[in-house]
């Protein structure tokens, strides 16, 4: 066994992430510290394996389903690359060319696309109060389908950005910061400055800063958010009490 890989395995053996198995990933603040650290550790291990030409295939066959209800470049290609890295083929669902346009329900669509699927990645960030709820509706539908014997397995859902959080991007940013400063233990007190960015939808500019606030303050970092007046983020209740002290507001003129 490669010594570096063994080090990653030893680290994982010290973490409790058993509840993530066959689970879904909606929001980072729903995960424990051990679970977040396990994601970072596996990501580092996969990168090391890729760099050293060691196979990362977990699946011999299977599908990764992507559904983008908003435009995407980086996340779309990242999801496809990740599926390929693990041995899954990607099928992208175009709602405009599906029966959804003719009134097919979430339950019908979710179960249809889930045959032979191991993971579903969804981006739905356009409207406040809609995206995260839709993802939960999909999970409820495939869970019921599996329970009723329609599906032989329940695919895992990964949030590729909703109206509340952008967990994959925020964790990728966080891991880069961890590697830059030489470990999680070196992040406390570091300051992150973030500025509001224009988007045609209101939901997208909210989910990224909320995700950064929710994840980076968790590791003791100070987040400064600059935004126009009237564009304050609406922190989900679990974050309001525990993280607000590490957040500074700066209103742009």
Describe the residue ranges of each PLM region:
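A generic local structural motif
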Residues: 50-53, 106-108, 250-252
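Positively charged, low-complexity intrinsically disordered leader regions
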Residues: 1-77, 81
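Generic secondary-structure signature for well-ordered alpha-helical cores
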Residues: 41-48, 88, 118, 122, ...
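Glycine-rich phosphate/diphosphate-binding loop of Rossmann-like nucleotide-binding domains
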Residues: 69-84, 178-253
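Short, charged helix-to-loop "capping" segments that act as catalytic/coupling loops
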Residues: 32, 125-133, 144, 197-209
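Generic alpha-helical secondary structure signal
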Residues: 33-37, 104-107, 133, 236-239
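Short, conserved catalytic or adaptor-binding loops enriched in Gly and charged residues
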Residues: 18, 142-152, 238-244
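Phosphate/diphosphate ligand-binding glycine-rich loop within oxidoreductases
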Residues: 57-178
């Amino acid at each position: 066994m490669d010594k570096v890989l063994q080090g990653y395995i030893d680290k994982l053996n010290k973490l409790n992430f058993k509840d993530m198995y066959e689970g879904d990933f909606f929001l980072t603040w729903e995960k424990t510290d051990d679970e977040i650290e396990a994601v970072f550790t596996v990501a580092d291990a996969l990168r090391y394996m890729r760099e050293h030409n060691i196979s990362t295939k977990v699946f011999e066959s299977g599908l990764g389903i992507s559904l983008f209800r908003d435009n995407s470049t980086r996340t779309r290609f990242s999801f496809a690359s990740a599926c390929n890295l693990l041995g899954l083929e990607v099928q992208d669902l175009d709602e405009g060319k599906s029966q959804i346009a003719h009134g097919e329900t979430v339950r019908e669509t979710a179960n249809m696309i889930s045959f032979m699927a191991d993971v579903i990645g969804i981006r739905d960030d356009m409207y406040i109060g809609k995206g995260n709820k839709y993802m939960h509706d999909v999970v409820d539908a495939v869970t019921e389908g599996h329970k009723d014997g329609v599906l032989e397995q329940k695919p895992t859902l990964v949030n590729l950005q909703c109206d509340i959080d952008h967990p994959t991007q925020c964790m990728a940013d966080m891991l880069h910061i961890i590697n830059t400063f030489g470990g999680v233990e070196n992040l406390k007190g570091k300051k992150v400055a973030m500025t509001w960015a224009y988007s045609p939808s209101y939901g997208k500019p909210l989910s990224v800063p909320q995700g950064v606030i929710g994840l980076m303050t968790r590791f003791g970092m100070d987040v400064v958010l600059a935004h126009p007046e009237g564009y304050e983020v609406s922190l989900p209740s679990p974050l309001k009490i525990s993280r607000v002290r590490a957040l500074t507001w700066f209103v742009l003129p």
